[in-house]
Swiss-Prot record:
CDD domains: Ec2MCS_like_1 (cd06117). It comes from Cupriavidus necator (Alcaligenes eutrophus). Homodimer. Its EC number is 2.3.3.5, 2.3.3.16. This is 2-methylcitrate synthase. PANTHER family: CITRATE SYNTHASE (PTHR11739), CITRATE SYNTHASE-RELATED PROTEIN DDB_G0287281 (PTHR11739:SF25). Substrate binds at residues 78, 196, 279, 346, 365.
Amino acid sequence: MSEAQPLVTPKPKKSVALSGVTAGNTALCTVGRTGNDLHYRGYDILDIAETCEFEEIAHLLVHGKLPTKSELAAYKAKLKSLRGLPANVKAALEWVPASAHPMDVMRTGVSVLGTVLPEKEDHNTPGARDIADRLMASLGSMLLYWYHYSHNGRRIEVETDDDSIGGHFLHLLHGEKPSALWERAMNTSLNLYAEHEFNASTFTARVIAGTGSDMYSSISGAIGALRGPKHGGANEVAFEIQKRYDNPDEAQADITRRVENKEVVIGFGHPVYTTGDPRNQVIKEVAKKLSKDAGSMKMFDIAEALETVMWDIKKMFPNLDWFSAVSYHMMGVPTAMFTALFVIARTSGWAAHIIEQRIDNKIIRQSANYTGPENLKFVPLKDRK
């Protein structure tokens, strides 16, 4: 367990709207209270990221506690049973063109599932948790059923016997069970992405939930928010930056020139963390292990070289997205699916926040600072020029 550090109050960032504003209460997560820490329901991310399976973290967030050995076995069996897709959902996914972004596919899949298996009108908590479990179990099925059908006309079987959500995703993607290293790497990355307090997509989910809307609508809205390159899409952009270079020296020279020209480099800095992203040290080690296992250090070395330059020149640290891009690439995940994996993980956090917002039972309605014109004289339509 990490030692307690003094709490800090980060300065609001001009580039982030509402930075530093407290918008509500949560018992789910704390971010950056000492500058570089992250806790899920009181547990330090550095204690659980590599030691827990993703299903343990999902149980912690959605069901309120870390499971016992028997509870975990039962939970994994439940999730495994929820991987299948209703025929209507498959039919809808077959209409989505191959050119669609995976995030749009997942948003569509969630919406269709919400019409086929709608939430009960009373929005009871056990039912909400069941929906969250079904979504975490089947989001990979939705994406990869669409992917194989739209790209090569294959209707794949999505119900595999893989032990984990991450293993299930990789199995459907590649058509074979992943190695233990890949499955462990996927578990760790999903753990790191699972929850992050009042970020844009989570707050979107809470705003929707606060209106009394259903779980599917709240999750769909969150997916829409996460799709943006300033939020979840950052890991895709990060890899596009990394892959344009052939070697670390070329990367360092070019990025130095770009930074000097005031270009923003996606994958560095964070709206809340002030001294570093605690998730980076974990995912960087994952990326390194995967690269060594593949016998190809090129992308890792380039990413690390860029990390050094950004710190030396700008004193900016990499966030989770930077080395997760390398990790997913080394496991053969298409770049456009990077953020989709984020969705699978973050659904656990979103669902927990939706349930928490429902318990609070208040609509979220903030005020705006008006900056428009005042006291204009009305001109009837016939007199306007």
